Swiss-Prot record:
GO cellular component terms listed in the entry, alphabetical order: chromatin; nucleus
Disordered: annotated segments: 1-49, 201-221
Bias-annotated ranges (Basic and acidic residues): 24-35
Organism, as annotated: Homo sapiens
Record-given protein name: Transcription factor HES-4
Keywords: Developmental protein, Differentiation, DNA-binding, Neurogenesis, Nucleus, Repressor, Transcription, Transcription regulation
A single BP term in Gene Ontology: nervous system development
Orange domain segment(s): 110-143
Short sequence motif named WRPW motif, residue ranges: 216-219
Gene from which this protein is expressed: HES4
Quaternary state and interactors: Transcription repression requires formation of a complex with a corepressor protein of the Groucho/TLE family.
Domain bHLH, chain residue ranges per copy: 34-91
Signal peptide range: none
A Pfam family per the record: HLH
Length: 221
């Protein structure tokens, strides 16, 4: 009878295979998916940094302006930034005034540099064919007016009398004054709409000898 009794079926080596094969490993996330998942965390950190910096800026600006923090406890972010901008502009004006008081030649150097930039703009516009004459005249007139607002360049008293002036005396060409260029290849022709630059000056010849090379160019003398 024992021989007729069927025994337990032996465990097949492939019995557990389907269960393990059905479990696929997780696919690695792409860089875009990683950025998308981490974006909220990064945004939270960014906002925390901004708020922390604004809090420190508020403390600094109130201390600099000598204002009580208790009276300005509910300042908005825009108010903090505007107060900071106004304070920095005020500091810049103070620094410029202090620099001029310490060295009067600073304004002359700044004016000379502005004059050189004006001359460079004039040279650039002279080589641009598409710039209308009225646009060029208005631009040069505006820059010359800005140069006039800087005030006349004064030689510091510490310089010896033999030291050369910062700019040569103006000349006249074709009835219109020339703005001297400090080291530039040619001076600037002052626009006629600037009455402050058209003061009486010694007359200069309107025409000169023309050689085979072309018309007379007074700025190449």
């Amino acid at each position: 009878m024992a021989a007729d009794t069927p025994g337990k079926p032996s465990a097949s080596p492939m019995a557990g295979a389907p269960a393990s094969a059905s479990r696929t490993p997780d696919k690695p996330r792409s860089a875009a998916e990683h950025r998308k998942s981490s974006k909220p965390v990064m945004e939270k950190r960014r906002r925390a940094r901004i708020n922390e910096s604004l809090a420190q800026l508020k403390t600094l600006i109130l201390d600099a302006l000598r204002k009580e923090s208790s009276r300005h406890s509910k300042l908005e972010k825009a108010d903090i930034l505007e107060m900071t901008v106004r304070h920095l502009r005020s500091l810049r004006r103070v620094q410029v005034t202090a620099a001029l008081s310490a060295d009067p030649a600073v304004l002359g150097k700044y004016r000379a540099g502005f004059h050189e930039c004006l001359a460079e703009v004039n040279r650039f516009l002279a080589g641009c064919e598409g710039v209308p004459a009225d646009v060029r005249s208005r631009l040069l007139g505006h820059l010359a007016a800005c140069l006039r607002q800087l005030g006349p360049s004064r030689r510091p008293a510490s310089l010896s009398p033999a030291a050369p002036a910062e700019a040569p005396a103006p000349e006249v060409y074709a009835g219109r004054p020339l703005l001297p260029s400090l080291g530039g290849p040619f001076p600037l022709l002052a626009p006629p709409l600037l009455p402050g630059l058209t003061r009486a000056l010694p007359a200069a010849p309107r025409a000169g000898p023309q050689g085979p090379g072309g018309p007379w160019r007074p700025w190449l003398r």
